[in-house]
């Protein structure tokens, strides 16, 4: 047998093995009865979460994408689904005045930051990490809480809002992602406030979506994440205004800059 023949046989055998393994995993995944709310899985995975995702995030250059997104945060900031705090190192902490490219006065940096996650175990990891990264920044709060229940701190009779809301890789684990986004829009400053999202979900390509769909129950059961959600449709149904949208990795990684629709309407009046 020629070298070419041996190579072809080896490749075909390996591909056959991969396909057989994939079919077994699909059969196993489809047999699972997994609820839509799988957020409790993070209580179990919290201690090892960073180690489990570190390599894949490096390969996908997610650190740079997180940094580019989080550096936009300013004013009073809320991060929901903060997990173990994989965004902590990217925050520009400490509010100060500056100017944009057109010379207009702007506020830069974060006056305060509130971190929220449904998992107490995840919050504890994030709290410890923040203390090591930013020991001198005191205007920070950590809460184990559902994002749909978050309200800004009271300021008497005057309505209060967050200037920036950040969420990365959170819509995949929420039982009601549309309702959560709508709530976040209601507590975002209506004129200049912003909601910053970095999410993963469905692809541009049907063949990849089929793989995601077939393996989704097993992935959700193990990792607490429905990786086949249509992020674009969730955002559309939320009613928030899309300021910026980008996608990478065959369309499975989604970035959004959003704002409340009422803010853009008021600004025009």
Report the location of each language-model feature.
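Conserved class I S-adenosyl-L-methionine
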Residues: 13-74, 86-90, 211-217
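A short acidic, Gly/Pro-enriched loop at the edge of an enzyme's catalytic core
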Residues: 148-165
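Class I SAM-dependent methyltransferase SAM/SAH-binding core
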Residues: 72-153
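A short SAM/SAH-binding and catalytic strip from SAM-dependent methyltransferases
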Residues: 160-177
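C-terminal alpha-helical "lid/dimerization" subdomain adjacent to the S-adenosyl-L-methionine
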Residues: 56, 196-255
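A short glycine-rich, Lys/Arg-flanked "PGG" loop and its adjoining helix->strand segment in the class I
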Residues: 178-194
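The conserved SAM/SAH-binding core of class I Rossmann-like methyltransferase domains
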Residues: 10, 116, 198
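Terminal single-pass membrane anchor helices
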Residues: 1-33, 37, 183-186, 238-241, ...
């Amino acid at each position: 047998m020629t070298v070419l023949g041996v190579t072809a046989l080896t490749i075909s055998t390996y591909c056959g093995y991969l396909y057989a393994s994939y079919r077994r995993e699909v059969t196993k995944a489809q047999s699972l009865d997994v609820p839509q709310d799988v957020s409790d899985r993070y209580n179990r995975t919290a201690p090892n979460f960073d180690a489990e995702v570190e390599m894949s995030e490096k390969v996908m250059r997610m650190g740079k994408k997180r940094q580019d997104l989080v550096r936009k945060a300013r004013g009073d900031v809320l991060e929901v689904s903060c997990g173990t705090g994989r965004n902590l190192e990217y925050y520009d902490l400490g509010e100060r005045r500056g100017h944009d490219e057109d010379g207009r006065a702007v506020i830069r940096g974060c006056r305060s930051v509130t971190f929220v996650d449904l998992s107490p175990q995840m919050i504890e990891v994030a709290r410890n990490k923040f203390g090591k990264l930013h020991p001198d920044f005191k205007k920070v709060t950590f809460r184990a809480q559902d994002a749909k229940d978050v309200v800004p701190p009271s300021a008497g009779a005057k309505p209060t809002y967050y200037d920036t809301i950040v969420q990365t890789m959170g819509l995949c684990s929420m039982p009601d992602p549309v309702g959560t986004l709508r709530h976040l829009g209601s507590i975002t400053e209506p004129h200049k406030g912003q909601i910053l999202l970095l999410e993963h979900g469905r692809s541009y390509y049907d063949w990849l979506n089929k793989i995601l769909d077939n393996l989704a129950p097993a992935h959700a059961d193990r990792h607490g994440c429905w990786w086949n959600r249509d992020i674009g449709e969730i955002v559309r149904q939320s009613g928030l205004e899309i300021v910026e949208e980008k996608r990478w990795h065959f369309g499975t990684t989604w970035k959004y800059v959003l704002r409340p629709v009422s803010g853009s309407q008021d600004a025009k009046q």
